[in-house]
A protein has these predicted regions:
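N-terminal Rossmann NAD(P)H-binding glycine-rich loop of SDR-like oxidoreductase domains
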Residues: 3-23
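Conserved glycine-rich Rossmann-like NAD(P)H-binding loop of the short-chain dehydrogenase/reductase
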Residues: 23-36
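NAD(P)H-binding glycine-rich loop region in Rossmannoid oxidoreductase-like domains
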Residues: 36, 43-80
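Glycine-rich NAD(P)-binding loop of the Rossmann-fold in SDR/ketoreductase-type enzymes
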Residues: 47, 76-87, 95, 132, ...
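Catalytic helix-loop patch of NAD(P)-dependent Rossmann-fold dehydrogenases
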Residues: 79, 115-153
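Conserved Rossmann-fold NAD(P)-dependent oxidoreductase catalytic core, especially the SDR/UDP-sugar
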Residues: 87-128
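Alpha-helical substrate-binding/gating segment
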Residues: 161-167, 177-199, 206
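Conserved C-terminal active-site "lid" loop/helix of NAD(P)H-dependent oxidoreductases
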Residues: 200, 206-223, 238-270
Length: 274
């Protein structure tokens, strides 16, 4: 089975391009940037229907990672994460591709208070409560996915990804970390399961202090093995922040908003922020 990875030259894309072939998947990349290694890749932009149509030929599933990675001015968010997301789903529908794994984000629910009590885990179907325009765009993608499932019978897993990194970078990520190996395990499970209709799934490792439930992922066959607790905090960056009372962390603070990023150049269209 050939799987198309959009955003294949980005961080998660490169990681999956290394790990998924060992799990039996034949991959094709789609990105504006050149491919890493010997990955078969179609060069193009996710807002270009013709380029997407070419990339979808012979594909059985799509892992949609491409998009604006963090907060940005609205035109950037709109083009990459709304128009681009729509074009990917439409191209999949035209090509008869029935399964999509969509990279959503915890920032789709970022203003949700972090859980307390026992068990202190938010369910995967926590309602949208976005913390930024970026988060709004990810909530849009989830709603669009639901539409394509209900209207066209597609099968979609929306991964509310936490902090994707080689190791946990800060205190918050001790709860939100998704290791590269567990990311591959999660995507592999979503591609293989015969139980998929529409699913919201937390993209998180088996962290002993995680805020989010892995129940939905495990029902699809996800078996996370990595735990942020095995990594010892060794720097002042591991001090807890007041913003960690909300799921979105620093994205929820008053001084984090469009004014902060208005002068930035757009990032490469591949998702991942914590």
């Amino acid at each position: 089975m050939t799987v198309l990875i959009t955003g294949s030259s980005g961080g998660i894309g490169r990681s999956l391009a290394r790990s998924l072939p060992a799990l039996g998947w034949q991959l094709r990349g789609f990105d504006r940037e050149p491919a890493a290694g010997d990955l078969e890749q179609v060069r193009g932009d996710i807002t270009d229907p013709a380029a997407l149509d070419a990339a979808m030929v012979g594909v059985r599933a799509v892992v949609h990672l491409a998009g604006q990675a963090v907060e940005a001015p609205w035109p950037v968010i709109r083009d990459a994460n709304l128009e681009g997301c729509y074009q990917v789903f439409e191209a999949a529908r035209r090509a008869g591709v029935r399964r999509v794994v969509y990279a959503s984000s915890n920032h789709a629910v970022g203003f949700t208070p972090r859980p307390t009590g026992d068990p202190a885990e938010l369910p995967a179907d926590t309602p949208p409560r976005p913390d930024t325009l970026y988060g709004v765009s990810k909530a849009f993608g989830e709603a669009l996915a639901r539409y394509y499932v209900d209207r066209y019978g597609m099968q979609v897993a929306c991964l509310r990804i936490g902090t994707f990194a080689e190791t946990p970078p800060d205190a918050r990520s001790m709860a939100t970390w998704l290791s590269p190996a567990d990311c591959a395990r999660l995507v592999d499970a979503c591609l293989r399961t015969d139980q998929l209709g529409f699913a919201l799934v937390w993209g998180v490792s088996a962290n002993s202090g995680r805020w989010w439930s892995t129940d939905t992922g495990q029902a699809l066959g996800y078996r996370p093995l990595d735990d942020a607790g095995r990594h010892r905090p060794g720097s002042p960056g591991f001090a807890a922040q007041a913003s960690d009372l909300l799921v979105g962390g620093a994205f929820t603070t008053p001084d984090f908003g469009i004014d902060e990023v208005a002068d930035r150049s757009p990032r490469t269209r591949e998702s991942r922020s914590g």
